[in-house]
């Protein structure tokens, strides 16, 4: 808030609203609103599914297909902060849909680009684990081992929204963390 107050020469208190979140061990794009009106308008875009979120994930094993769609029913267990994917709808489950495209094959891993159609709790982590491809370092969702820094190799690569006042399409892109696994995964 102090940065915004100084940069925009704001008198009095400064508004800063969190529009969306990332799982704690995930890296990438997070956006904030500087006004309550912008917060309301962008939240409505998320509610109406007018936003587009792309993620990069390094997954255990070499993913079988080059692209596809995963559709599951996700049920959240708040007691252990985990969501479970199911093939069929069950009580209190929500439909989760994601699209994936293989970016690169590595020796024991591959890099996927994931586009979310729905935004459910731990959706990417749960669905990829359910089909046998947990995210590297994600012990909660069956990865073989943790990363040394306890992060997981899931990165919120980009977020596309409409500017809350001008309605211009904006795409915010975040570079992956400077870590050996990402450097190796994305090198040519």
Question: What residue spans do the PLM features occupy?
Answer:
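RNA pseudouridine synthases
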Residues: 1-188
């Amino acid at each position: 808030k102090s940065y915004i107050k100084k940069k925009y020469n704001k008198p009095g208190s400064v508004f800063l609203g969190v529009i969306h979140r990332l799982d704690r061990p995930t890296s990438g794009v997070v956006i904030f609103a500087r006004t309550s009106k912008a917060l309301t308008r962008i939240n409505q875009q998320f509610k109406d599914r007018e936003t587009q979120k792309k993620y990069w994930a390094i997954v255990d094993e070499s993913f079988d297909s080059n692209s596809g769609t995963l559709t599951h029913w996700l049920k959240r267990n708040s007691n252990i902060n985990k969501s479970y994917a199911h093939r069929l709808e069950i009580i209190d489950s929500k439909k989760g849909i994601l699209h994936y495209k293989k970016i690169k094959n590595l020796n024991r891993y591959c890099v996927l680009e994931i586009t979310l159609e729905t935004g459910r709790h731990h959706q990417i982590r749960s669905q990829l684990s359910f089909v046998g491809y947990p995210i590297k370092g994600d012990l909660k969702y069956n990865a073989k081992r943790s990363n040394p820094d306890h992060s997981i190799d899931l990165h919120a690569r980009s977020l596309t929204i409409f500017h809350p006042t001008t309605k211009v399409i904006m795409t915010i892109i975040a570079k992956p963390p400077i870590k050996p696994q990402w450097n190796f995964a994305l090198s040519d």
